[in-house]
Design a protein with these regions (language model features):
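Membrane-embedded catalytic cores of phosphoryl/pyrophosphoryl-handling enzymes
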Residues: 2-139
Length: 140
């Protein structure tokens, strides 16, 4: 690994050398994505989390951030992701995402597939009912 090389954004180098440090937005995105995907596919957690770590480390390697910026980005991502778990809507969407992933990846049992199909039909009926209601309201 090489350090003190030019950054991936040489046009910003003069400013980056004089500016204060800040949490890495790239790291926040990468680590949040890794946490989310790990929850959907826990069987691949090691691989997914390593990739999420590398996403942040790349910011140090190219000279865009200090290591502390990347560490702060991961901390911010973990805090936000933790907070998302207080939302019933988020938890329901995660449950559906895990279910859909297991089916599409061929990991679901027959019971899980039947339950998913039944829920999908229920959601489709509710969506059709809401669309009809909206159409009726728009025509009045």
């Amino acid at each position: 690994m090489r350090f003190h090389e030019h950054t991936a954004t040489p046009q910003f180098e003069p400013d980056l050398r004089r500016n204060f440090s800040y949490p890495s937005g790239h790291t926040i995105l990468g680590w949040t994505s890794a946490l989310l995907l790990t929850e959907i596919n826990p069987e691949r957690a090691d691989t997914i989390l390593k990739r999420g770590m590398m996403y942040g480390e790349s910011r140090v390697i190219v000279g865009a951030h200090w290591q502390s910026d990347v560490d702060a980005g991961r901390l911010a991502a973990a805090a936000v992701y933790s907070r998302m778990h207080t939302s019933e809507r988020f938890l329901e969407q995660m449950r559906l995402a895990r279910q859909e992933f297991r089916i599409k990846a061929g990991l679901a049992t027959i019971v899980e597939m039947k339950a998913y199909k039944k829920e999908a039909e229920k959601r489709a009926k509710a969506a059709a009912k809401a669309a009809a209601k909206a159409k009726k309201a728009a025509s009045n």
